[in-house]
């Protein structure tokens, strides 16, 4: 039986227009996101997850980017159909360039990536599709 969870995250742009991506457990690359805690709004969860996974906490909210559904990433990079996630995403900007994941065991690396290289780096196809869909609304 498939478990359904609600997740929130963000596309974070720095002053050079680069996008923040994070390594998940040393095996996959993703936009920063994670589960919404009890009593937390999706936007609050997104900001918390960005901080935990990358160390970036100086965020300026720009806009809601909508949501999409996807299965959890399996160890082989495919779909783990045991968990279906509804992922709500937000756009943030930051002037903070230094990265330092707080949860370094689960997220050993975060990096700034040129916008044109992000989709190729993301592991899950649904993350790639979502990113490619929202690129036109991202500020230059």
Model regions: which residues?
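Conserved N-terminal beta-strand and adjoining loop/helix that marks the start
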Residues: 1-19
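A residue-level structural signature of the nucleotidyltransferase/glycosyltransferase Rossmann-like core
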Residues: 3, 28, 110-111
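A short beta-loop-beta micro-motif enriched in histidine and acidic residues
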Residues: 7, 83-85, 105-107
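Conserved Nudix-box catalytic region and its N-terminal flanking loop in Nudix hydrolases
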Residues: 14-57
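Short aromatic/basic micro-patch
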Residues: 30, 84, 112
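Active-site segment of metal-dependent pyrophosphate-handling enzymes
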Residues: 55-98
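NUDIX/MutT-family hydrolases
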Residues: 89, 93, 100-132
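C-terminal alpha-helix
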Residues: 133-138
